[in-house]
């Protein structure tokens, strides 16, 4: 095992424990991990318990971005801590020594409930029947619009959200507003026939039309309102609802804006269900402060509750939090840069799977859904991402 980077001038005698400690710090620095060496420890721990394991599964269990996990895995393979197999990542003999002697890992079993997969609830026959209907309608969703941070949750996720609201007493007889609903969580919620009122506010007319068709076909009532949430809610929606549910853009200002519109709908008190991506500690502190400054407390948070279709950057998973609010206060930040692409602009490079040509997305072409190759190819694979500096 070599040590990444320089350790002072000349040769340095270090024992194995010091070598491993230096390795952790240097891997974290090399991979540019905001969480530091603890994140590298978490990756090794997950591999120790679950090997062989895929990069995607590691990202889900550690709640780290997939590109970060992939980078750490590559570095640890280079350092002979990990080896790559057809079934996924495994520890080498040196890696096992590192895990057991330095990190003091001993027990290799996961204690996460295999029935509920950590969600804390299961679907009975009633909700399974609802899920089967939601699966059919979810297939009719339009292409995602990545410029407004759309990322569709799986039908299972949407149904589990409705089941969680039921289990916590936030469904029966309640007035519920979905502040954005590209995940179609209003569908399983309506199919329970338990809520007093259900309404959806969204900027995407395609999503609203699909919800309207669903309502007509299934004989349920969901009020749909096309609205840009950068503007205050219509007057007839204010202080009307008991519960709001939102999966906002994954920026602090995006969260503030969507929760503030939810507060307009709730009034001085109420319940909010917030779905959001796992963040480094500094960002998470900002998020917690924003939530508590509005008058909410996080009464419950379930990691890896939500799963998404094709959202590799967040390892396809986010948490759900149940917020309880009293003496609520609106707290709106910068409404111009609420979407991830505006706060952290990137250029993505996609390879045409038909001819192999490389295309840039993020400048003239804003989203891969609009990309068509000269050869006629319409299927692409992302091969590289580059961060851009904000202007």
From Swiss-Prot:
Domain of life, source organism: Archaea
Signal sequence bounds: none
Sample GO molecular function, one term: transferase activity
Coiled coil: none
Disulphide connectivity of cysteines: none
Gene3D superfamilies: Vaccinia Virus protein VP39 (3.40.50.150), Winged helix-like DNA-binding domain superfamily/Winged helix DNA-binding domain (1.10.10.10)
GO biological process: polyamine biosynthetic process
Family annotation (Pfam families): BpsA_C (PF01861)
InterPro entries reported for this sequence: BpsA (IPR014435), BpsA_C (IPR002723), rRNA_MeTrfase/Polyamine_Synth (IPR051720), SAM-dependent_MTases_sf (IPR029063), WH-like_DNA-bd_sf (IPR036388), WH_DNA-bd_sf (IPR036390)
Record PANTHER family: RRNA N6-ADENOSINE-METHYLTRANSFERASE METTL5
Name of the protein in its database record: Uncharacterized protein MJ0675
């Amino acid at each position: 095992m070599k040590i990444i980077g320089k350790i002072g001038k000349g040769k340095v005698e270090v024992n194995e424990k010091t070598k491993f400690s230096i390795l952790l710090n240097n891997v974290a620095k090399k991979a540019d991990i905001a969480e530091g060496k603890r994140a590298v420890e978490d990756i090794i721990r997950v591999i120790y318990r679950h090997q062989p394991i895929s990069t995607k599964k590691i990202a889900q269990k550690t709640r780290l971005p997939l590109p970060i996990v992939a980078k750490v895995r590559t570095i640890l393979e280079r350092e002979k801590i990990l080896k790559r197999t057809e079934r996924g990542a495994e520890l080498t003999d040196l890696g096992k020594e590192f895990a057991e002697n330095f990190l003091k890992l001993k027990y290799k079993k996961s204690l996460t409930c295999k029935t509920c997969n950590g969600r804390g609830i299961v679907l009975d026959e009633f909700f399974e029947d609802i899920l089967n209907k939601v699966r059919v309608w979810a297939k009719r969703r339009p292409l995602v619009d990545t410029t407004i941070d759309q990322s569709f949750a799986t039908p299972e996720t949407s149904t589990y959200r409705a089941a969680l609201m039921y289990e916590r007493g936030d469904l029966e007889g309640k007035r519920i507003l979905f502040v954005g609903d590209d995940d179609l969580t209003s569908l399983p919620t309506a199919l329970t026939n338990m809520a007093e009122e259900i309404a959806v506010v969204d900027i995407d007319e395609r999503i609203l039309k699909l919800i309207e068709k669903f309502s007509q076909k299934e004989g349920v009532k969901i009020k749909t309102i096309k609205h840009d949430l950068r503007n205050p809610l219509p007057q007839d929606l204010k202080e009307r609802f008991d519960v709001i549910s939102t999966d906002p853009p994954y920026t602090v200002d995006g969260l503030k804006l969507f929760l503030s519109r939810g507060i307009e709908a709730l009034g001085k008190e109420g319940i909010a269900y917030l779905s959001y991506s796992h963040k480094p500690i500094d960002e998470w502190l900002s998020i917690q402060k924003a939530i508590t400054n509005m008058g909410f407390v996080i009464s419950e948070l379930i990691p890896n509750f939500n799963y998404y279709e094709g959202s590799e950057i967040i390892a396809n998973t986010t948490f759900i939090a149940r917020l309880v609010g009293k003496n609520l206060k609106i707290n709106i930040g910068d409404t111009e840069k609420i979407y991830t692409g505006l706060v952290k602009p990137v250029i993505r490079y996609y390879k045409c799977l038909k001819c192999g040509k490389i295309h840039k997305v993020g400048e003239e072409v804003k989203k891969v859904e609009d990309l068509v190759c000269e050869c006629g190819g319409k299927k692409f694979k992302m091969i590289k991402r580059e961060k851009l500096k904000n202007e």
